[in-house]
């Protein structure tokens, strides 16, 4: 059975460690006969949740005009969601956390999803990286019948220089 796979890459660097693993995951998903799409969060405008309760208490769409609604609709439509992040200060990137916070209005529609997590860090201590997975688990605890299918830990990965193709990189 063909599955719709949505890969959310929250690396701030195109071609960075977690983004590279996303590309490999996507290749494998397609080679296995699935549909796959990668959303590179860095290229999207996603505003912070303001806690206005328009979505949660009033059942109306978020009044913010950005790319979050489109991404969240893709999450609702997907069978499999891959959430990938570099680990900064022992947690997920701000880009990923901001998207998760914006899921408030439609999280009840994310039912029976399969999840994979990709976490990368310069650390070699997997236990420290598991803090990030625990944060993802907190999100899944709010969903109906999610299943964690796997976690990819990319450890001891160091960033040495910006990619020549990525002129917006900074140190």
Describe the residue ranges of each PLM region.
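N-terminal beta1-alpha1-beta2 submodule of the flavodoxin-like/Rossmannoid cofactor-binding fold
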Residues: 1-84, 90-101, 105-106
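Short beta-strands and strand-loop turn motifs
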Residues: 8-9, 84, 117-121, 151-153
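Short histidine/acidic/glycine/proline-rich micro-motifs that form metal-
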Residues: 12-15, 87-90, 121-126, 157-158
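Short beta-strand elements in bilobed, periplasmic/extracellular small-molecule ligand-binding domains
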Residues: 36-38, 146-153
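Short beta->alpha junction loops
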Residues: 41-43, 153-158
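Short, proline-centered helix/strand-breaking motifs
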Residues: 85-86, 165
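Short, glycine-/small-residue-rich phosphate/pyrophosphate-handling segment
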Residues: 111-149
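Single conserved hydrophobic/aromatic residue that forms the stacking wall/gate
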Residues: 159-170
């Amino acid at each position: 059975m063909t599955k719709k796979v949505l890969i959310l890459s929250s690396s701030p660097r195109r071609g960075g460690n977690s983004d590279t693993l996303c590309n490999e995951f996507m290749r494998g998903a397609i080679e296995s006969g699935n549909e796959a799409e990668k959303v590179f969060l860095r290229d999207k405008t996603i505003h912070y949740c303001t806690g206005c309760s328009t979505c949660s208490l009033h059942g109306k769409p978020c009044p913010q005009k950005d790319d979050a609604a489109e991404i969240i609709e893709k999450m609702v439509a997907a069978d499999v969601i891959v959430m990938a992040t570099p680990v900064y200060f022992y947690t997920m990137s701000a880009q990923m956390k901001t998207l998760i916070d914006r899921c408030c209005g439609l999280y009840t529609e994310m039912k029976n999803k399969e999840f994979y997590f990709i976490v990368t860090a310069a650390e070699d201590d997997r236990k420290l990286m598991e803090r990030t997975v625990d944060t993802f688990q907190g999100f899944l605890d709010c969903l109906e019948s999610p299943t964690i299918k796997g976690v990819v830990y990319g450890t001891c990965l160091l960033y040495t220089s910006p990619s020549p193709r990525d002129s917006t990189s900074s140190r």
